[in-house]
Regions:
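Conserved catalytic submotifs in the C-terminal HATPase_c
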Residues: 78-80, 100, 105-115
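Short helix-loop "hinge" at the ATP-lid/N-box region of the Bergerat-fold HATPase_c
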Residues: 134-135
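Conserved glycine-rich
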Residues: 140, 201-202
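Short beta-strand/loop element within the Bergerat-fold HATPase_c
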Residues: 141-152
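Conserved micro-motifs of the catalytic ATP-binding
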Residues: 72-77, 115-121
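Short alpha-helical segment of the dimerization/phosphotransfer core of two-component systems
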Residues: 52-57
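Short conserved segment of the HATPase_c
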Residues: 162-174
Length: 223
């Protein structure tokens, strides 16, 4: 009975959080469309901004569905192993433009033969979410290093860092630090990382502090 009650409270809380997260970009879309209908409005610019908000909602919905699949066990994270270096290099290349705009440098550190116990797609999802988090929040001039070692994947930046009491909350769904609230992002990236790693039998931990950057370590069982 207690377990059922706890599950229901979690479900209700998650539904409320999803509703809140969708309401904000939806309100922006409606405001932009109303403004676009006014005489003399720059319709092209306003419609482009509205499109960006719709794309943000689509990303949020995709993340919610993926997280739901992970939690229900319908999406399998661990199925064999994947060489880490090609995946990390691919992610670094894919995010090069956004990293350049944020003035964040990405470095990949992995030996060619290092493998991690995740399907390729899952390793890419983990690495991309870790990298995107640093790109958004580390601050200009920071360096993000993606490191793969046997049974370990680390994303460490030397950016602004966070208060130590915020670090354990990074993996909560929809959690954003005070500084991150104005930044774009679904608020689910690190929650997805945690669930993917956990479904492969691993653990995730964040460390760091103000002015010391953030280090996120994903540790997997030894083969």
């Amino acid at each position: 009975m207690e377990e059922a009650r706890a599950y229901e409270e979690l479900r209700v809380g998650f539904t409320a959080a999803v509703s809140h997260e969708l309401r904000t970009p939806l309100a922006r879309v409606l405001a932009l469309l109303e403004t676009a209908a006014l005489p003399g409005a720059d319709t092209a610019v306003l419609l482009d901004q509205a499109r960006e908000q719709v794309e943000e909602m689509a990303r949020l919905i995709d993340d919610i569905l993926f997280l739901s699949q992970l939690e229900s066990g319908r999406e399998v994270a661990a199925l064999g192993t994947t060489r880490a270096l090609p995946v990390l290099e691919e992610i670094a290349g894919r995010l090069a433009d956004s990293a350049e705009r944020a003035d964040v440098r990405i470095v990949v550190d992995a030996e060619p033969d290092v493998e991690l116990p995740l399907r390729r797609r899952m390793l890419a999802i983990v690495a991309e979410n870790l990298a995107e988090n640093s790109i958004r929040y580390a601050g200009p001039g920071a360096t993000l290093t993606l490191t793969a070692r046997p049974s370990e994947l680390v994303a460490a930046d030397d950016g602004r860092g966070l208060e130590e009491d915020e670090l354990p909350r990074l993996f909560e769904r929809f959690y954003r630090s005070d500084r991150a609230r104005a930044s774009r992002g679904t608020g689910l990236g690190l929650a997805i990382v945690k669930h993917v790693v956990a479904s492969a039998g691993g653990q995730v931990e964040a460390s760091g502090g103000p002015g010391r950057g953030v280090r996120i370590t994903c540790t997997f069982p030894a083969p």
